[in-house]
């Protein structure tokens, strides 16, 4: 008979030979899922509390489990806990150490529980905490954008469509566009959190358990409750242990947040380039070149743009991971953690650095205004002026196109064309047209809810400040 330590794995009594070292390395997750240790201990303590309340384990066993978990917490926090590859994952490592510390009570902890519902609970608990942190970071970034918007309400930026100069906008208004995007990202995170915050524990391996578990007690202990304080428990044991849609949904929300950061990054990269020259980014967020001494490279926005592809890739990976799995749990689901962990880390790091970087942006109003003038940004204002004089808008549009052509020929802005020249295109044009053709006049004219007029921008800034606190 081939002798080996059948206690090295929790499931090894059935087997006649040990797992190969290659398979151990291939199937082990402990060196990345150990970050779940706090959630694992919290879930185990709540489970033990319920087992004792239901008289499934004795009070002495409950006390021993609490003592052992407190000791394990101290060891992990002190960096003294020995994580073992042989024990596969965070769950068995902690359980083995608990049994080593307190004996049989540690063996009783797993009563009525499977690793299938245990890991699903741990990931949900961990992700809930991370979503709360991300919500705070999204708030910080929005506040930073509101501050730079407030300082630059009167600064005129050429607004673009198709990357062509379109109409003048307030730089503050432009910044607030991203505040709106990130506020929706925060809303999505809260919606995801509501679905993450449901308890799988008690589903056991896939079919539930014959023990009289009080799942709602565990949910309440772990804070898995709704807005009214009612416990939120997964209602189908098969679904509870097998689906990772909550991880996919979070990664989708994270991908959207990163896409918004990537769009902002693209603009910062363009605006910092010599071709635009609209802004400077503080030196601490840029790098130089090893060969070209004149270079100041926007590495942080470029990396954020690149990391967006990585996070979106994780979303596609998780969707593909789930698409072919039959019910219930399959080992495939071990592959959910690394992309989920990396998505969380990437999003948090990016939000932190962008909130700080926004505060280090220097705006160059003169360069922005020159660019707006070069692009005939007030052409639409002239068309609106003619429409208000009674000309159908399509005719006004054509008339202004001829005026722009004339200005281009003479290499001047529309506001620099003499009145007599403008009247050649339409005799109803009067001297007051120059108020319309100025960048400032164009900006002030958009005094409508959601518009770019400084008065509207200041109102939106006040609204966001009240919302963000």
UniProtKB/Swiss-Prot annotation:
Pathway: Amino-acid biosynthesis; L-arginine biosynthesis; L-arginine from L-ornithine and carbamoyl phosphate: step 3/3. It catalyses: 2-(N(omega)-L-arginino)succinate = fumarate + L-arginine. Its main location: cytoplasm. SUPFAM superfamilies: L-aspartase-like. It is an enzyme of class 4 (lyase). One of its GO terms (cellular component) is cytosol. GO terms for biological process: arginine biosynthetic process via ornithine; L-arginine biosynthetic process. It is found in: Cytoplasm. Its EC number is 4.3.2.1. The keyword Cytoplasm applies. GO terms for molecular function: argininosuccinate lyase activity. Pfam families: ASL_C2, Lyase_1. InterPro entries: Arg_succ_lyase_C (IPR029419), Argininosuccinate_lyase (IPR009049), Fumarase/histidase_N (IPR024083), Fumarate_lyase_CS (IPR020557), Fumarate_lyase_fam (IPR000362), Fumarate_lyase_N (IPR022761), L-Aspartase-like (IPR008948). Keywords: Amino-acid biosynthesis, Arginine biosynthesis, Cytoplasm, Lyase. PANTHER family: ARGININOSUCCINATE LYASE (PTHR43814:SF1). Belongs to the lyase 1 family. Argininosuccinate lyase subfamily. This is Argininosuccinate lyase. The gene is argH.
């Amino acid at each position: 008979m081939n002798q080996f330590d059948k206690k090295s794995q929790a499931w090894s009594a059935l087997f006649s030979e040990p797992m190969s070292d290659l398979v151990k390395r291939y199937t082990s997750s402990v060196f990345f899922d150990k970050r779940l240790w706090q959630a694992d201990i919290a879930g185990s303590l709540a489970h033990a509390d319920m087992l004792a309340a239901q008289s499934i384990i004795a009070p002495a066993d409950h006390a021993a489990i609490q003592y052992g978990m407190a000791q394990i917490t101290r060891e992990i926090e002190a960096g003294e806990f020995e994580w073992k590859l042989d024990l596969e994952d965070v769950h068995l490592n902690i359980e083995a150490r608990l049994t080593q510390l307190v004996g049989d009570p540690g063996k009783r902890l797993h009563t009525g529980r499977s690793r299938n519902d245990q890991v699903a609970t741990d990931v949900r608990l961990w992700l809930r905490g991370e979503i709360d942190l991300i919500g705070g970071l999204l708030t910080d970034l929005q506040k930073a954008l509101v501050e730079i918007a407030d300082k630059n309400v009167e600064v005129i930026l050429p607004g673009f469509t198709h990357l062509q100069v379109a109409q003048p906008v307030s730089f503050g208004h432009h910044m607030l566009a991203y505040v709106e995007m990130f506020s929706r990202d925060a809303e999505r995170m809260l919606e995801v959190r509501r679905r993450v915050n449901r308890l799988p524990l008690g589903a056991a391996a896939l079919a539930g358990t014959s023990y009289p578990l009080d799942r709602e007690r565990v949910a309440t202990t772990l804070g898995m409750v709704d807005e009214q304080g009612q416990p939120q428990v997964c209602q189908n044991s098969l679904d509870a242990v097998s689906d990772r849609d909550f991880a996919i949904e979070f990664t989708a929300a994270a991908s959207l947040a990163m896409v918004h950061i990537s769009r902002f990054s693209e603009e910062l990269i363009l605006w910092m380039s010599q071709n635009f020259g609209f802004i400077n980014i503080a030196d601490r967020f840029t790098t130089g070149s090893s060969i070209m001494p004149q270079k100041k490279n926007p590495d942080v926005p470029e990396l954020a743009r690149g990391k967006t592809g990585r996070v979106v890739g994780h979303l596609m990976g998780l969707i593909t991971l789930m698409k072919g799995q039959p019910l219930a749990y399959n080992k495939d689901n071990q592959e959910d953690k690394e992309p989920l962990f990396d998505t969380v880390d990437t999003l948090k790091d990016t939000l932190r650095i962008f909130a700080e970087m926004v505060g280090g942006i220097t705006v160059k109003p003169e360069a922005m205004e020159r660019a707006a003038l070069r692009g005939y940004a007030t052409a639409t204002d002239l068309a609106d002026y003619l429409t208000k004089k009674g000309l159908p808008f399509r005719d006004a549009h054509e008339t202004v196109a001829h005026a722009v052509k004339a200005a281009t020929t003479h290499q001047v802005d529309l506001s620099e064309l003499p009145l007599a020249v403008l009247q050649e295109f339409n005799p109803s044009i009067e001297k007051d047209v120059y108020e319309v053709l100025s960048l400032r006049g164009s900006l002030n004219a958009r005094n409508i809810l959601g518009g770019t007029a400084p008065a509207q921008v200041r109102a939106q800034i006040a609204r966001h400040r009240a919302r963000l606190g």
